[in-house]
Amino acid sequence: MMKKWKYALMVAATALLIPTFASRAEMPPIGMPSPLVEYKTYHALAEATDSRPLFLPKGTLLAGQCHLTDYIAIGGKLSDIRYRMDDGSTLSVRTARLVGEEAGKNISGVYTGRWESRMIGATEVMTAKTMDGSLAAFWTEGEYAFSVVGRKMSDDVFDALLSDVFVDMSEHFY
């Protein structure tokens, strides 16, 4: 009789402990980690993306009206440098090192609007205006892909930045 009680007690204890062990199982994290990582300096962003990100130099067209807001790496390969102007418009400048046969790659993040080809200097640049009025451009130079997106920005300011600063810099330094 004593053996039956020991056996019953052992079965009961096991039944009580099984849910305890099962509840300690680790649950996998839900969702995916963000591919966006912010950096504090240009050099940290360049190192993280193994590239030389295109940027808006101080003292150019919008001197004193343009403020750097973010250095962001996207997926560890694409840099996104963001600016805010005094008038509330914003500018995003992206750079990615091309791998293999990625020439002509659109890294702007803009996939609506009608893209048109135009020559700026010796570079073919694809430009578009979206339904919300944002202006976008992308092009490649050497082993790099570039894009610039302006939101709430006049066509004249965007075009001047694109031709006089960004495409010009990419033709001379990349």
What does each model-identified segment do?
Residues 1-24:
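Sec-dependent N-terminal signal peptides of Gram-positive bacterial secreted proteins and lipoproteins
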Residues 13, 50, 91, 123, ...:
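Amphipathic alpha-helical interaction segments
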Residues 24, 123-125, 162-166:
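Generic hydrophobic/packing signal
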Residues 26-135, 141:
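Short, solvent-exposed recognition patches
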Residues 135-137, 167-168:
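Noncatalytic linker/hinge segments flanking ATPase motor cores
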Residues 142-144, 148-174:
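Surface-exposed amphipathic alpha-helical segments
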